[in-house]
């Protein structure tokens, strides 16, 4: 692997800063927050904290300043009950937890993680360890499975069968992509841009998160509506915006620990970009994606009053994810530490030294 995106600390050509694109100003969608958001956010933090005895003190501090529950309150502000909001908040908190524990895993370890979690989704009533060759599971369920079983059992108590099927399908895609990412990490390779985009659309966890928009609203869209090309374009556009903007916001922390699963790195590695020109390029892609999303909203067909109402609320949920994630990225300490609100104003990011995040 060419190490050019992570030049030696003493190299005179290593950049020291970059300027963020002003995506917040480009996005004109209204920002809303669920009235039960703060209460539910605290409950989700307490849930994961108390359910994970192996977390280090550093990991517990990071959980407290992550504010995944606040992200939920922005992005699922239409949730019809505190109980539904809580399930989604627990899932997003859990999803960040999965991201943290899968970072650095070898391919075989991600296989084990996937089997444990998917077991909970498919056999929710009771832990049923698999015994197939190469897929043997321990008699005692691992903690990621217990957590998944806990929030999923609450979800399916009042969840449409279509939503359940789509959630399990998209979580399967998530783990397949995490496995591919682990394989690239094992082989110390950086993928080409097209391959990266395909994998990143699944490692982001956006697809199951979009399914939970339906759950939060208490709806179950018909398959022919979900599969319509315009609906698919709206889903993918939202995924791309959230994912690509996250590559910009998370780049500083990731470069400090040598993480290459980022579009900025690929543009620098294979397409001759400087750090700033790569950031600008991805920022322009994000702006175009917001514009295309607005155009696709106007192209939605009609399926009759009842379905049209469900579709309108669902698309509003995608829109809430776009604007909510942009604002939340400066509120959480995951990307910019305690400087997020200041960086949101001046958009100037000073690069962390290498290995600082470890």
Curated annotation (Swiss-Prot):
InterPro entries: Isoprenoid_synthase_dom_sf, Terpene_cyclase-like_2. The DDXXD motif is important for the catalytic activity, presumably through binding to Mg(2+). The record marks 96 as: Plays a critical role in the stabilization of intermediate cation. Mg(2+) 3 binds at residues 246, 250, 254. Its cofactor is Mg(2+). This is Sesquiterpene synthase Agr3. GO terms for molecular function: metal ion binding; terpene synthase activity. It comes from Cyclocybe aegerita (Black poplar mushroom). Its EC number is 4.2.3.-, 4.2.3.125, 4.2.3.126. The lineage of its organism: Eukaryota, Fungi, Dikarya, Basidiomycota, Agaricomycotina. A motif (DDXXD motif) lies at residues 99-103. Keywords: Lyase, Magnesium, Metal-binding. It holds the Pfam family Terpene_syn_C_2. Mg(2+) 2 binds at residue 99.
């Amino acid at each position: 692997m060419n190490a050019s995106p992570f030049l030696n600390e003493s190299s005179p050509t290593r950049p020291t800063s970059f300027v963020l694109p002003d995506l917040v100003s480009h996005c004109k969608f209204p920002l809303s927050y669920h009235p039960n958001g703060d209460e539910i956010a605290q409950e989700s933090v307490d849930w994961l904290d108390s359910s994970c005895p192996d977390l280090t003190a550093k990991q517990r501090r990071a959980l407290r300043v992550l504010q995944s529950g606040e992200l939920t309150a922005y992005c699922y502000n239409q949730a019809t009950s505190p109980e539904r909001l809580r399930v989604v908040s627990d899932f997003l908190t859990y999803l960040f937890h999965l991201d943290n524990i899968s970072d650095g895993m070898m391919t075989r370890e991600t296989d084990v993680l996937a089997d444990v979690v998917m077991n909970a989704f498919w056999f929710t009533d009771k832990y049923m360890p698999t015994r197939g060759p190469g897929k043997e599971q321990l008699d005692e369920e691992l903690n990621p499975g217990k957590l998944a079983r806990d929030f999923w059992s609450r979800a399916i108590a009042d969840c449409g069968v279509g939503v359940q099927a789509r959630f399990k399908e998209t979580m399967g895609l998530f783990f397949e992509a995490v496995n591919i990412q682990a394989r690239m990490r094992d082989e110390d390779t950086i993928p080409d841009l097209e391959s990266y985009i395909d994998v990143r659309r699944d490692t982001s966890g956006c697809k199951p998160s979009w399914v939970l928009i339906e759950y939060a609203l208490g709806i179950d869209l018909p398959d022919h509506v979900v599969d319509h090309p315009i609906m698919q374009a709206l889903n993918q556009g939202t995924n791309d915006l959230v994912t690509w903007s996250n590559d910009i916001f998370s780049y500083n922390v990731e470069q400090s620990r040598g993480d290459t699963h980022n579009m900025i790195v690929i543009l620098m590695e294979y397409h001759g970009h400087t750090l700033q020109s790569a950031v600008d390029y991805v920022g322009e892609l994000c702006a175009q994606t917001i514009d295309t999303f607005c155009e696709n909203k106007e192209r939605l067909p009609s399926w009759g009053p009842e379905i049209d109402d469900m579709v309108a609320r669902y698309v509003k949920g995608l829109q809430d994810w776009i604007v909510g994630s942009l604002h939340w990225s400066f509120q959480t300490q995951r990307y910019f530490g305690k400087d997020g609100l200041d960086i949101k104003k001046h958009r100037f990011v000073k690069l962390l030294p290498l290995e600082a995040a470890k």
